[in-house]
């Protein structure tokens, strides 16, 4: 755990230049690395030494940024991937396979829901989706002998459900499995799930971490707190020899703090790819350096937008946990005391047709599939990101047909509100 505040770590964690070295770490744009002898390289292939030999597994630039994100979350180890989808897939597939079972909150990003309910189902991994507001008894009833993890989002995209992390962590640990949390919308600036019992955190770094809609990427951070050895029979991939590395046992060789990420890197990344380019990681780091400043502005602007919409006669409903009357306000005060995120959701009176007319009338805000970057953008999830869901699945995910997802940027709040006002006048 770093001794610095998070705003300092956003600038300095992961890289401290030596005498005469560049203040900004270099982009190591190379596929391979030279060694003097085959013996030296052989030790890398046997995991007996640390170093780099092929960028499909690891690269110095990537690892520098991963170390920064690890520090921001307060974890023990981290890795970067080519997208948030890849991060969520690796996070699950690293400990679960054909014949295994995962519990997930229903209130998650549509792409993640499809990954779980369609793609990973075809791979033999079964998912049970639970209402995030279910009782402890209902949550515990969802577990099976072959359950390997529980998954949720700190702030759900796009429903903005604030998950009760402690409730889900308690249930997961009672059944000997880790809690995996996607912390994309909150970022470690506003919430550190490890402090509430979460074991593994994922991110779509494409969103606030990058912050400028420049690079697609993902991250996985391990807390190092989950005792894989205590439940060795559940997690043989970590606690028994890996034949592809001459019988190395990850928990023995790398300890509880390094086993999970090491396996995901040297086994899954080796076989499946998904490594981001060093250049993309360099660009991601530029975004990370200003993350606290941007999150503060995003939250301030979103609060102003939510308050404006709440009083507008053409708005049917508004949801933003920063509003005192919001159903997640008290929970947000507990888990996200410094602010939630820059996304506000609402419904325009007149339903879907009115929402689409409103969106078409916006001049400053862009209609885009993206969310959580510096420029304001807007989306209708039911016809885009959650289009693959049926009506029942949409309802379970908290996505109504009239829901508008408004990603508030860091422009002047007066200009954002003026754009909303002129668009609503024509509805």
Name what the model sees in each region.
Residues 74, 146, 314-317, 364, ...:
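Glycine-centered tight turns that cap/initiate beta-strands
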Residues 272-275, 279-281, 286, 290, ...:
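Conserved small-domain helix->loop->beta segment predominantly found in fold-type I
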Residues 7-16, 78-311:
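Conserved PLP-enzyme active-site core in the AAT-like
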């Amino acid at each position: 755990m770093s001794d610095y505040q998070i705003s300092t770590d956003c600038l300095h964690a992961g890289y401290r230049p030596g005498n005469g070295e560049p203040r900004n770490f270099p982009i190591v744009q190379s596929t391979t690395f030279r060694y003097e002898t085959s013996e030296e390289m052989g030790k890398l292939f046997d995991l007996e030494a640390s170093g780099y030999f092929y960028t499909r597994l690891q690269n110095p630039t990537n690892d520098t940024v991963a170390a920064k994100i690890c520090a921001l979350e307060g974890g023990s180890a981290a890795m970067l991937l080519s997208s948030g989808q890849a991060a969520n897939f690796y996070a699950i597939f690293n400990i679960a396979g054909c014949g295994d079972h995962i519990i997930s909150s229903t209130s998650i990003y549509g792409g993640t829901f499809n990954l779980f309910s369609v793609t990973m189902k075809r791979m033999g991994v079964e998912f049970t989706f639970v209402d995030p507001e279910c009782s402890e008894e209902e949550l515990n009833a969802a577990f099976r002998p072959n359950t390997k993890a529980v998954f949720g989002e700190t702030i759900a995209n796009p429903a903005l459900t604030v998950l009760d992390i402690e409730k889900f962590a308690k249930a997961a640990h009672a059944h000997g499995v880790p809690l995996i949390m996607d912390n994309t919308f909150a970022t470690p600036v506003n919430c550190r799930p490890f402090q509430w019992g979460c074991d593994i955190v994922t991110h779509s770094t494409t969103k606030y971490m990058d912050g400028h809609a420049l690079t697609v990427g993902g991250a996985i951070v391990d807390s190092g707190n989950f005792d894989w050895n205590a439940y060795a029979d559940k997690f043989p991939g970590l606690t028994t020899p890996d034949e592809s590395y001459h019988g190395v046992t990850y928990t023995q060789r790398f300890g509880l703090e390094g086993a999970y990420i090491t396996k995901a890197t040297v086994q899954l990344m080796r076989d499946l790819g998904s490594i981001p380019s060093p250049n993309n990681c360099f660009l991601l780091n530029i975004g990370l350096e200003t993350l606290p400043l941007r999150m503060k502005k995003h939250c301030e602007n979103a609060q102003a937008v939510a308050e404006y919409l709440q009083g507008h006669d053409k708005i049917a409903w508004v949801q933003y946990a920063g509003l005192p009357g919001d159903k997640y306000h008290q929970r947000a005060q507990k888990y996200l005391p410094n602010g939630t995120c820059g996304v506000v959701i609402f419904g325009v009176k007149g339903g879907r047709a009115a929402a689409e007319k409103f969106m078409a009338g916006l001049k400053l805000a862009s209609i885009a599939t993206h969310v959580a970057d510096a420029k304001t953008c807007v989306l209708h999830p039911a016809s885009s990101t959650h289009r693959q869901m049926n009506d029942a699945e949409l309802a379970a995910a908290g996505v109504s047909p009239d829901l508008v997802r408004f990603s508030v940027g860091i422009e002047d709040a007066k200009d954002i509100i003026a754009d909303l006002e002129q668009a609503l006048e024509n509805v």
